[in-house]
Amino acid sequence: VHDYRLVVQKSFKEASSSGGDGSSSSQAGAGRDASVTLSLWALNPALAFDDLAGANAARCVVLTSGTLAPLNSFASELGVQFPIRMEAPHCVDVGKQVWAGAVGVGPRGAQLCGTFKVAAEFAYQDDLGNALKEWCVDIPHGVLVFFPSYSLLDRVTSRWKSTGLWKALEQATGKKMFQEPRGNERGFEASSGRGGGRGGRGGRGGGRGRGLAQSGDTNALDAMLAKYYRAVRASVSAAPHPHAPAPASHPARGAVLLAVVRGKVSEGIDFADANARGVVVVGVPYPNVKDKRVELKRQYNNEGVSRGLLSGDQWYSQQAFRALNQAVGRCLRHRNDHGAILLADERYLRDDMTRHLPK
């Protein structure tokens, strides 16, 4: 019983009123649709894994992924020791095929630190755009830029569009700018409400509405990706050879896709070769500390340290770096692939953060 938490959540969605001309509008205070959800959350992943690896389950279970490390913490969460382990080197020559670095200061001297307080400042948002403009001039073809949340992504892009930086970035780089549509978040991004509010995608209680909204989200994502790939192909076609950038005089020199960590773009889509010659990660993708799932999981782990569980803080930190590993892996999809990885946050320069970064 101690592995579960019973949670009651109440969410609201503004009620819309229809006008005589067929239009609809939302009236503040006029009424809100409320939905109540009763959930039983299992906070111990070992409960589910026991069905696979328990005494009466499979005789052999093999887990393979590029983001399982550190293996001790993974084994702790699943409650299995895994007596046979292997951490293989990457299939690419990291010294020759990858350039990776962390940047803590923008071109005009602004501190690049994606904490809530700093990220709300215009100086941060503007210099992040200035830095991205410089990087995308040098990185050929396709560039992926990952933000820790939709809220920060929306805030930054709104600022860039209002100041003209969005258009200036396109003009300076010759790259078309694209943004991942909302509703594609997974994991804690989806549960926290950071990606579109707790009533987003049809509300928590609306089964059919939720399904229709997800279908629409998928269609929007597919349409956006088709345009992104088309822009990259145009750039590759203009290049003197596949590994070279398009000429600076060519009007179509690639594309930039702004997306969120833990979204479909960062975890579920393959961007091989020219589709991702560079990956930029903005900030450190910690889960939303105010999300109830995160809060309860941290408490649960703190209570279970004596049983060999990670502490709540250790678990919380590793969620960020596993998500980071998924995102940066978008630019290295096979042994002949190559690309640049830029971590746009001064915290990545600290020793206590560097030791968590992938090899």
Q: Can you describe what each PLM-predicted range is?
A:
Residues 1-359:
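ASCE RecA-like P-loop NTPase motor cores
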